[in-house]
C-alpha cells in the first residue's frame, strides 16, 4: 500500500492542538456570558412591561379617549389700524380661552371636552385636542401657550400645554389640586384656585412655582394675580384674612386679619380690596399689609351683582400710562382705573371687562360700540361700530389686523 504524499512509512502524523486557555480568561468569559444573559433578560422584561403598560392604558381608557390634530403655523398677520366700522365675518359657539384668546393668527376656543385652534381669518378649525372621557375645567392662552385643564374623577388636575400656533403638545402633567378649580392667566404663569388651595404653575413647562394650602378650617374666597403678587382672601370660621404671596416665588409676604370678607380687586398698580358692605376701597402696603381706606368705589347696592359674578381666580388687567405710571383697570358694572397710590383715576361706562393695549384701554361701551380710551384719563380716543350688534354684555375686545375679536359668551370676529 502506498503512503500518502509527504509522509514516509513509520513517521507519526502531526496533530495541531489549541493552546490552553488561561484560567483567569476562562473565568472572565464565563462571567461575561452570564452577565450578558442577565442583561438580555432584563431588557426583555422591560419591553414586556412597556407593552403591558400601553395595553393597560388603552384598556383603562387613558389613551384611547385622546384625539387631536396639529397644523402648520398660520402666516403672519399684518399690523393695521382698526377701521371706524367693522362687520361680522365669522362666529363660533366656542367659549373663549381666558387670558388672551388670540395669538399668532389663531383664536383659541373650547367646548365641553375639546380645545380648538381656529383660523383668525376664517373661523375654521386648524387644530384640535380632545378627551372624550373628561370634561374641561378651564382653557387659557398666554405667551403663545394654550393650557387645557381637564376634570378627571371630580378633580381638575389633568393639564396639557399646547403650542398655540400649531396645536402640538408641549407638556402634560397631573396636578395635586382637589375638586373643581377656576383658573386665570398672568404673565408667564397660570393661577388655579380651589376651595382650599391656590396653585401657581409655569405656563411654558407646567412646573410648580408654588402650591399654597389654606390653614385648617379656612377656605379660599378669591385670588387675584398681579405684578405685586397674588392677593388671596380667606374665611376661617368667623374670621377673615387677606394673604399676599409672591407671583412666581414661593414666598409668604404677609397675612392680615380684616374685619369683613374683603374682595381682592387690585394687585398691580397697588394692593387693594373692596369692602362689599360699604363699597369702600382699601389699600394695603406691600411690605406689611397696613390698611388705608382709599374712598368709596360705588354704593353697595350698585356693586352687589357685579361682585357676585367675579371669578374665584383672576389676573389684574394692567399696563402703563404715557407717563410711565402703573395702570390697572377693573370692571364692576363699569370700568374703574386705579392709580399706584390706591385711588381711582377715572371711571367709564362699559358692558364688559377691558383689554389694556399699550397706552390704550379697549372696551365695549354698548352692544354696538367699542371705544379706545386714553389710559391716563379714560377719555374716548376712537370708536368702532360693530355690525351686527353683540347679543349682550360681558364681551372683551382684542385687536386683529384691521378688525376686532369680541370674546364673551361666544367668539365673534369683526373686520
Language model segments and positions:
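Short, flexible helix-coil linker/hinge segments at the edges of structured domains or between repeats
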Residues: 203-220, 232-233
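Aromatic (tryptophan-biased) beta-strands that constitute blades/sheets of beta-rich domains
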Residues: 2-3, 15-40, 53-105, 113-114, ...
Amino acid at each position: 500500500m502506498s503512503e500518502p504524499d509527504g509522509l514516509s512509512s513509520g513517521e507519526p502524523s502531526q496533530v495541531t492542538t489549541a493552546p490552553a486557555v488561561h484560567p483567569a480568561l476562562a473565568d472572565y468569559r464565563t462571567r461575561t456570558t452570564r452577565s450578558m444573559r442577565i442583561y438580555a433578560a432584563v431588557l426583555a422584561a422591560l419591553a414586556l412591561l412597556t407593552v403591558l403598560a400601553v395595553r393597560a392604558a388603552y384598556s383603562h381608557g387613558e389613551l384611547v379617549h385622546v384625539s387631536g390634530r396639529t397644523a402648520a403655523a398660520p402666516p403672519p398677520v399684518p399690523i393695521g389700524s382698526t377701521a371706524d366700522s367693522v362687520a361680522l365675518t365669522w362666529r363660533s359657539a366656542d367659549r373663549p380661552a381666558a387670558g388672551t384668546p388670540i395669538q399668532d393668527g389663531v383664536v383659541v376656543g373650547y367646548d365641553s371636552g375639546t380645545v380648538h385652534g381656529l383660523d383668525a381669518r376664517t373661523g375654521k378649525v386648524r387644530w384640535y385636542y380632545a378627551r372624550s372621557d373628561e370634561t374641561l375645567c378651564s382653557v387659557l392662552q398666554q405667551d403663545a401657550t394654550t393650557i387645557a385643564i381637564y376634570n378627571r374623577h371630580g378633580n381638575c388636575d389633568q393639564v396639557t400645554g399646547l403650542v398655540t400656533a400649531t396645536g402640538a403638545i408641549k407638556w402634560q402633567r397631573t396636578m395635586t389640586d382637589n375638586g373643581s378649580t377656576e383658573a386665570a392667566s398672568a404673565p408667564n404663569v397660570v393661577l388655579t384656585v380651589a376651595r382650599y388651595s391656590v396653585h401657581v404653575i409655569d405656563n411654558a413647562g407646567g412646573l410648580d412655582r408654588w402650591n399654597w394650602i389654606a390653614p385648617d378650617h379656612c377656605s379660599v374666597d378669591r385670588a387675584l394675580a398681579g405684578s405685586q403678587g397674588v392677593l388671596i382672601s380667606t374665611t376661617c370660621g368667623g374670621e377673615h384674612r387677606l394673604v399676599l404671596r409672591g407671583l412666581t416665588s414661593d414666598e409668604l409676604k404677609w397675612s392680615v386679619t380684616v374685619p369683613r370678607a374683603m374682595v381682592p380687586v387690585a394687585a398691580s398698580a397697588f394692593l387693594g380690596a373692596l369692602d362689599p358692605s360699604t363699597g369702600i376701597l382699601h389699600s394695603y402696603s406691600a411690605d406689611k399689609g397696613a390698611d388705608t381706606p382709599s374712598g368709596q368705589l360705588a354704593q353697595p347696592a350698585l356693586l352687589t351683582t357685579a361682585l357676585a359674578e367675579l371669578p374665584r381666580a383672576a389676573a389684574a388687567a394692567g399696563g402703563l400710562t404715557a407717563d410711565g405710571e402703573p395702570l390697572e383697570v377693573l370692571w364692576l358694572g363699569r370700568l374703574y382705573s386705579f392709580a399706584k397710590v390706591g385711588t381711582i383715576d377715572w371711571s367709564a361706562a362699559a358692558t364688559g371687562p377691558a383689554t389694556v393695549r399699550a397706552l390704550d384701554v379697549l372696551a365695549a361701551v354698548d352692544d354696538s360700540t367699542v371705544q379706545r380710551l386714553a389710559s391716563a384719563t379714560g377719555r374716548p380716543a376712537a370708536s368702532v361700530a360693530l355690525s351686527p350688534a353683540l347679543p349682550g354684555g360681558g364681551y372683551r375686545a382684542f385687536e386683529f389686523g384691521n378688525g376686532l375679536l369680541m370674546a364673551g359668551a361666544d367668539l365673534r370676529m369683526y373686520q
